[in-house]
Structure formats: structure tokens, C-alpha cells
């Protein structure tokens, strides 16, 4: 029987759910508090140039393909799919005075161990995609789980697993381990699967849709609307109950509620109590988006990763929610006409930051120091912000405005045993069978593959 379904939030989690549920024939209304589609994946203009904020790299394309296949199975017609442009490298990493591209080139001393590592993880690409798109404890996922256990054995964290690889140089371990920050947590708090992700990304490559990342939520919204879903912007949900979702303006009756909000915010809207900041939280970011007066020097790659000299020190700072001495930064650089049809070059400098609600800007001492360090390491003669024509800074305070308290990008940080199939919260609870949870705070990992996979898993019984 078609149901009245209210989806809360028009980010990637909400839109993935809305497209599939509407295509299945349910009556779907999406309520979004902001005035844009995409949540953290937002499109802005800086000095007349189009820049997408939030996610910048598209990984694990098998999850996207699984979504499209499900949409078609339900009878949906696909418009032209996105054109994914594979970047020449996974990234150029700057670490302790060295500069290393991934995949590690033959000329680098780490080439052999890197090749060995990639070879050991090659067979896990399919199983990881299966696990990302399978409900917890789904029997069909057991063979995939078996393949992972064959590689990791009893090593339960990324750190434990990497430390067991006696043949691997310590620096290479650090470089692989830092990728757990893409899930907002340190490598002692994540499953070993995160180590494999680096190797798989190196094989599969990373990509960006032509036109930019915001093309992803735009296409999802189009599929949802073409399937009959109604997407209402500027509708802030004030309370959620078994039969109704209330905004400031009106009440929407609902047989089912799909919430893509941070789990703590969903709970607060149900209980009527004020949401509490989780003591242990995933990281936030200071994200600086700029249009440049002139392109960066020739040879600057699209995606650079500037590592801290002492990753352990950064993990400690993030755990105690204090400012780091040095952090891990992404520098995403687009030449004019690359990916976007911009006339000017643009850059995003994304500094990993504590989830402390702060309103940091370029004058904040640790941000200033990091910008200078990043500029120097990527080979600029002047601080990068001297090349900005105009810029915009998004920080923990901004992310808190529509997400988890503190600005934690992936919500609360759960104990290790809850970072797999037993994740907390679960997609559904026994006491509230009408509530389905999706979004970055639910499926471990929190990036686009986890959010889209998690949404498909959560609502599977409804489609
Ligand atoms: C700087 C940055 C870089 C990133 N880089 C990558 C990357 O390269 N690759 C990758 O895979 N992932 C990346 N991520 C993660 C990825 O962006 C997120 O995991 C994903 O976008 C989260 O989607 P979501 O639907 O869970 O949440 P959101 O996008 O936060 O959506 C939730 C929506 O709910 C709305 N909302 C909140 N409260 C209410 C309310 N009361 N009523 C109505 N609506 C409400 C919000 O406005 C928002 O639109 C990055 C994130 C950031 C911030």
C-alpha cells in the first residue's frame, strides 16, 4: 500500500531516499529548512565563479550504480547519467618534507610496498561495495564479510591492522591511516576496512562529475521530483511524532518519517527536549573556497593532501576538541574550464578542525599558520590567500547551523564495536517502527557512498 512519507532534509541521504520511495509509488514530501538542494553539498558563487562546497571527491562508484539500478528496477527512467571525470591521481601527499603521489610511482622508495598493499586489497573492491549497500547482518553479505576477514584476521582497528604489516614503512602506514579522517575519526577508532579504501581508491581512481559535485544532489532531486515527490525548501521541522511532522507553518501527516538529520537532532525533535552535544564527536572543518586572481603554478595537481608532521598529535587534538598544532588539509584546485566552466581558477583549502562550534577565520592563529604551511609545501612563493580575488569561509559554526552540534560532520563518535553492522543508532528502532534514519550520522563512514548506501539499506523494506 502506498504510504504518506515525510522525508526530512534535502541532503544526499534524504534525496536518495525520496527518489526511491517516490518511484516505488509512495506519496513523498521532502521538508528542507534551507533554501538550497544538497545540504552539505552546496553550490555557491565566489567572484562570479561556480564553486561546490562540502564533498569534492566521488568514490566507490559501485554504490551510485547500485542506486541507479534500484531506481530503474522500480520502473524509473534515467535521464542522461552524470559524466564522471577521473582525476589523474588519487592525490599528491605532502608529508615530512616528502612529496608522494598515490598511486605511488615507480621512482619512489615506497613503490614496492605500496604495490604489495594494493594487490592484497584488490579483491575487496566488490565486497566493500556489497557491504556498503547491504542491510546489517544481511545473509547475502556474508561472503563479502568473509573476504574481508581473510585479509584483516582478528585485527579490529585500522591502526592494529596496519601495525601488523611488518614489511610496510612506518611513513606509508601514517599516510594510509590518515584517510580515516575522511570519516571524521582517528585510525584507532575505525575498522581496518578504512585501510583498504585507500588501496581501492588508487585502483578505481577518484572522480568528480562534470559540472561539479552539486550535480549529484541536483540529479537526485530531479529523479525524486520526476517520480512524484514534492520537495519543499524553507521548511524547518520543529517536531516529529508518530503521525505528524510539524514545521513552523503547518503539520504534515505521515505514516512513515525518514529523517536524514543528525541522530541527536532527530531524537530532540521527537522528545521535545534540547539536543545535547555528544562528548565524543567526529571532526569538523574550516573550509576556505576562493576564486583566484591567477592560476596556481603549472603542475599543481587537482587534489593535494597536506599531512601534519605528527599525525598522532592531530588525533589527540581532535579527540579533546582542541585546536591542532598542525592538521590534515585538502587543497582542491580547478584550472579555468576544468570540471566547471569557470573563466577563473578556483581553489578550496579544507582544514580538518575540531567540532567545537567555533567561527574560525583566516586570522585565527592556527588557521593562519596552517595556510602558510600549506602554501609553502605546495610550492607557492606567497601565502595562498594573497592570490584570492574573493573567498568564503565555512567553519564548525556554519556546519552546526544545519547539522550536528559542535559542527561534527559525521555526528557522534561511537565505540569501535559500533562502527560496523551494529552501528548506533540503527536504521530503525523497535519502539518507533514508523521512523527510518538515514544520513551521515547513521551509516558508519559518513561519506557519500555510506550516505547513499545507508539510505538504500534503511528504507529497503519500503521499496
Ligand atoms: C567540507 C566537507 C568535505 C567533504 N568531502 C567529502 C568527499 O570528498 N567525499 C565524500 O564522499 N564525502 C565528503 N563529505 C561528506 C559528505 O558531504 C556528507 O557525508 C554528506 O553530504 C551528508 O549528507 P546527509 O544527507 O547525511 O546530510 P546533510 O547534507 O547535512 O543534509 C541534512 C539536511 O537536513 C536539513 N535540516 C537540518 N535540520 C532540519 C530541520 N529541522 N528541518 C528541515 N531540514 C533540516 C539540512 O539543512 C540539510 O540540508 C564532506 C563533507 C564536508 C562538510
Spans of features found by a protein language model:
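A glycine-rich dinucleotide-binding beta-alpha-beta segment and adjacent secondary-structure elements
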Residues: 171-183, 380-444
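General small-molecule cofactor/ligand-binding pocket signal
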Residues: 83-85, 230-234, 436
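N-terminal glycine-rich phosphate/pyrophosphate-binding loop and immediately adjacent elements
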Residues: 3-123
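C-terminal segments that line or cap access tunnels to active or ligand-binding sites in enzymes
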Residues: 295-397
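A conserved FAD-binding loop/helix module that cradles the flavin
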Residues: 55, 440-462
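Rossmann-like flavin
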Residues: 94-189
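Helical element adjacent to the flavin cofactor pocket in flavoenzyme catalytic cores
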Residues: 196-239
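Mid-domain catalytic core of redox enzymes
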Residues: 238-342
Amino acid at each position: 500500500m502506498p504510504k504518506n512519507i515525510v522525508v526530512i532534509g534535502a541532503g544526499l541521504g534524504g534525496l536518495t531516499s525520496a527518489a526511491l520511495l517516490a518511484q516505488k509509488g509512495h506519496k513523498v514530501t521532502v521538508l528542507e529548512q534551507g533554501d538550497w538542494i544538497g545540504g552539505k553539498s552546496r553550490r555557491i558563487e565566489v567572484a562570479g565563479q561556480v564553486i561546490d562546497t562540502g564533498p569534492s571527491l566521488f568514490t566507490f562508484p559501485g554504490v551510485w550504480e547500485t542506486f541507479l539500478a534500484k531506481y530503474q528496477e522500480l520502473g524509473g527512467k534515467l535521464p542522461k547519467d552524470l559524466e564522471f571525470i577521473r582525476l589523474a591521481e588519487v592525490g599528491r601527499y605532502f608529508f615530512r618534507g616528502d612529496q608522494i603521489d598515490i598511486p605511488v610511482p615507480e621512482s619512489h622508495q615506497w613503490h614496492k610496498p605500496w604495490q604489495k598493499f594494493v594487490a592484497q586489497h584488490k579483491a575487496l573492491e566488490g565486497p566493500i561495495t556489497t557491504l556498503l549497500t547491504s542491510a546489517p547482518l544481511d545473509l547475502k553479505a556474508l561472503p563479502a564479510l568473509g573476504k574481508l576477514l581473510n585479509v584483516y584476521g582478528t585485527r579490529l582497528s585500522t591502526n592494529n591492522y596496519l601495525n601488523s604489516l611488518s614489511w610496510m614503512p612506518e611513513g606509508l602506514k601514517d599516510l594510509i591511516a590518515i584517510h580515516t579522517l575522511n570519516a571524521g575519526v582517528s585510525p584507532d577508532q575505525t575498522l581496518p576496512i578504512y585501510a583498504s579504501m585507500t588501496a581501492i581508491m588508487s585502483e578505481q581512481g577518484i572522480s568528480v562529475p562534470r559540472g561539479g559535485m552539486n550535480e549529484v544532489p541536483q540529479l537526485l532531486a530531479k529523479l525524486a521530483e520526476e517520480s512524484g515527490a514534492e520537495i519543499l525548501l524553507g521548511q524547518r521541522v520543529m517536531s516529529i511524532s508518530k503521525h505528524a511532522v510539524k514545521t513552523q507553518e503547518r503539520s504534515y501527516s505521515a505514516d512513515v518519517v525518514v529523517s536524514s538529520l543528525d541522530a541527536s537532532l532527530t531524537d530532540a525533535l521527537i522528545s521535545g527536549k534540547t539536543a545535547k552535544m555528544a562528548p565524543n564527536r567526529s571532526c569538523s572543518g574550516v573550509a576556505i573556497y576562493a576564486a583566484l586572481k591567477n592560476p596556481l603554478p603549472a603542475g599543481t595537481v587537482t587534489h593535494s593532501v597536506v599531512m601534519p608532521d605528527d599525525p598522532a598529535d592531530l588525533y589527540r587534538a581532535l579527540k579533546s576538541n582542541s585546536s591542532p598544532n598542525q592538521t590534515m588539509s585538502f587543497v582542491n584546485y580547478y584550472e579555468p574550464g576544468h570540471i566547471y566552466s569557470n573563466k577563473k581558477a578556483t581553489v578550496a583549502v579544507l582544514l580538518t578542525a575540531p567540532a567545537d562550534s567555533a567561527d574560525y577565520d583566516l586570522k585565527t592563529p592556527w588557521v593562519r599558520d596552517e595556510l602558510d604551511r600549506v602554501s609553502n609545501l605546495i610550492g607557492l612563493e606567497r601565502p595562498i590567500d594573497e592570490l584570492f580575488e574573493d573567498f568564503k569561509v565555512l567553519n564548525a559554526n556554519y556546519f552546526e547551523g544545519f547539522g550536528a552540534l559542535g559542527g561534527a560532520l559525521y555526528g557522534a563518535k561511537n565505540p569501535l564495536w559500533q562502527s560496523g553492522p551494529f552501528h548506533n543508532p540503527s536504521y530503525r528502532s523497535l519502539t518507533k517502527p514508523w521512523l527510518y534514519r538515514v544520513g551521515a550520522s547513521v551509516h558508519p563512514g559518513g561519506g557519500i557512498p555510506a550516505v547513499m548506501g545507508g539510505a538504500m539499506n534503511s528504507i529497503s523494506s519500503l521499496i
